[in-house]
Amino acid sequence: MKISFRRLELSRFTLRVLWLEKDVAIAVDQIVGKGTSPLTSYFFWPRTDAWELLKAELEKKSWITEAERIELLNRATEIINYWQEEGKNHPVSEAQKRFSDVSFVGTA
């Protein structure tokens, strides 16, 4: 049931991830019709504190509910932790399989 709640909450948004050798970058897009519209710029980890910057950017958008912000930040945390702990040593295709609801591009 929790998975259904997550999908319902995130259905207005999607995460975009740049999967790089020395960094991972996360941005949020809003889903509009059958397309997407950029909502934030990319925030890079570990170059900057991507999670804190993303949190601050989402908090500026008062029309995003607290539940949606929490779900987006939780998902960003999962991606950053995966990249940090094991993912940076694996190709982007493996990350895409693990996080199938996220849009990935990368060179690593």
Swiss-Prot record:
One of its GO terms (molecular function) is structural constituent of ribosome. Belongs to the chloroplast-specific ribosomal protein cS23 family. GO terms for biological process: translation. HAMAP family: Ribosomal_plastid_cS23. Pfam families: PSRP-3_Ycf65 (PF04839). PANTHER family: 30S RIBOSOMAL PROTEIN 3, CHLOROPLASTIC, OS04G0461100 PROTEIN. Probably a ribosomal protein or a ribosome-associated protein. One of its GO terms (cellular component) is ribosome. Part of the 30S ribosomal subunit. Keywords: Ribonucleoprotein, Ribosomal protein. This is Probable small ribosomal subunit protein cS23. It comes from the Bacteria.
